[in-house]
């Protein structure tokens, strides 16, 4: 049997709907001369099973899911998933018979047609690069139980909402609160008696105090906190605050009153934190917030206590500290690469409290560990306040007064 005879015999088993025929034959004359016939009123398309003729019902199914979820969006992307071997097998065979080598398959057609319907009927905007929601059209062989449309009973709709990103600044007004969630050291976050089955080492975190207000407002799933650096648990963040971006995952409500969010967080945190300067940003902003430590500068207020009395010459030498070579501190080497990093001090102001205690105001490049700048960290920080005075010192109190990052 020749290839032509084989193709002719195969065409007797197939018929196409107008849309599938038009996909394969873009030229009307070619469609008129197609070796595969057009379906009649009793037939179903050999490729799409008449799904393309019932796209209005697919749209209604999408609309029903949007209303059920009460999901808000302005931009969208349509995705398709076909788990139906009959469709994929027949499409491949018909492409071979008709010598079709284009890329306008059934998935492309559904995406294009449904996108057009959503734009026209809902006034939404198709966005391939940065959609607010992704609408997945899933097609399988077996029918779905709760699909109300017999013609497309094997179609189901899933909608995923992409994250929203809100930038702001937080002030941490008390000590003893970490910035982000800290899994319990006993159960590793699983929940145990030691952590009251919360899975967390600390009851409150900056992230939790914000997310417990923002999640109900957005109907989001969870949050991820992106800070411009972080202060230690025993350190306060004062001044104008530390820049952060909070990422809300799977939000159903995207536009919330940020002024009201600020009021809620500030009034419900029992004086532990305050947030300000809230605004919506794109996902690119979280990277610039997190990776800004080298370009940024910070101002600290530190209390340094010395083993022996401090002289006026010691104070003079401390104020002259400039370039610091700092090896990764012992206390954080378990989570940071063991490297020597060079950081610059812009200015140090020293105020004597008593003969063995100084108040330091330090303006320095981001990424400098202040506690180790004072103690020397077993000579891993060179020079240090301890080494320059030949007098061992410890930081007994530390506050961050300012965090500056480039816009």
From Swiss-Prot:
HAMAP family attached to this UniProt entry? Pus10_arch
Q: Which NCBIfam families match?
A: pseudo_Pus10arc
Q: Which GO terms describe its molecular function?
A: tRNA binding; tRNA pseudouridine(55) synthase activity
> What is a single Pfam family found in this protein's UniProt entry?
Pus10_THUMP_arc
Q: What are the UniProt keywords, alphabetically? A: Isomerase, RNA-binding, tRNA processing
EC number assigned by the record: 5.4.99.25
Q: Would you tell me the protein name for this molecule?
A: tRNA pseudouridine synthase Pus10
The record places the active site at 232 (nucleophile)
**Protein's job:** Responsible for synthesis of pseudouridine from uracil-54 and uracil-55 in the psi GC loop of transfer RNAs.
Q: What class of enzyme is it?
A: isomerase
Binding-site list for substrate: 300, 369
The gene that this protein is the product of is: pus10
For this protein, the record's InterPro entries field holds: PsdUridine_synth_cat_dom_sf, Pus10, Pus10-like, Pus10-like_C, Pus10_THUMP_arc
* Keyword RNA-binding attached: yes
Q: Name the PANTHER family on file.
A: TRNA PSEUDOURIDINE SYNTHASE PUS10
Top-level taxon of origin = Archaea
Catalytic activity, per the record?
uridine(54) in tRNA = pseudouridine(54) in tRNA; uridine(55) in tRNA = pseudouridine(55) in tRNA
């Amino acid at each position: 049997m020749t290839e032509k005879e084989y193709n002719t015999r195969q065409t007797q088993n197939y018929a196409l709907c107008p849309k599938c025929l038009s996909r394969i034959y873009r030229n009307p004359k070619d469609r008129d001369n197609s070796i595969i016939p057009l379906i009649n009123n009793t037939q179903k398309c050999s490729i799409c099973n008449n799904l393309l003729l019932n796209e209005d019902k697919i749209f209604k199914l999408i609309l029903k899911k949007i209303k059920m979820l009460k999901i808000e969006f302005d931009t969208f992307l349509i995705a398709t998933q076909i788990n139906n071997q009959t469709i994929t097998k027949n499409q491949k065979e018909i492409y071979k018979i008709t010598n079709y080598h284009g890329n306008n398959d059934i998935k492309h057609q559904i995406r294009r047609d449904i996108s057009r319907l959503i734009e026209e009927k809902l006034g939404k905007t198709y966005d391939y690069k940065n959609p607010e929601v992704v609408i997945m059209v899933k097609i399988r062989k077996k029918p779905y139980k709760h699909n109300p449309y017999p013609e497309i009973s094997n179609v189901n709709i899933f909608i995923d909402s992409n994250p929203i990103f809100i930038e702001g600044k937080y002030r941490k007004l008390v000590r003893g609160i970490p910035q982000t969630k800290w899994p319990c050291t006993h159960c590793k976050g699983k929940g145990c008696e030691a952590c009251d089955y919360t899975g967390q080492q600390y009851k409150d975190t900056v992230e939790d105090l914000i997310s417990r207000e923002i999640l109900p407002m957005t109907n989001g799933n969870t949050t991820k906190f992106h800070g411009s650096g972080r202060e230690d648990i025993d350190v306060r963040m004062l001044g104008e605050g530390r820049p952060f971006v909070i990422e809300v995952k799977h939000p159903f409500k995207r536009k919330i009153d940020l002024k009201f969010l600020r009021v809620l967080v500030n009034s419900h945190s029992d004086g532990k934190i305050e947030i300000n300067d809230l605004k919506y940003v794109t996902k690119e902003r979280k990277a610039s917030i997190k990776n800004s430590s080298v370009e940024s500068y910070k101002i600290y207020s530190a209390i340094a206590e010395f083993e022996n009395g401090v002289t006026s010459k010691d104070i003079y030498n401390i104020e002259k500290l400039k370039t610091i070579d700092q090896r990764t501190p012992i206390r954080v080497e378990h989570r940071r690469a063991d490297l020597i990093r060079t950081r610059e001090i812009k200015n140090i102001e020293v105020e004597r409290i008593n003969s063995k205690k100084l108040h330091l105001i330090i303006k320095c490049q981001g990424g400098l560990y202040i506690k180790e700048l004072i103690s020397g960290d077993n000579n891993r920080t060179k020079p240090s306040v301890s080494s320059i005075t030949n007098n061992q010192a410890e930081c007994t109190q530390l506050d961050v007064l300012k965090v500056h990052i480039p816009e």
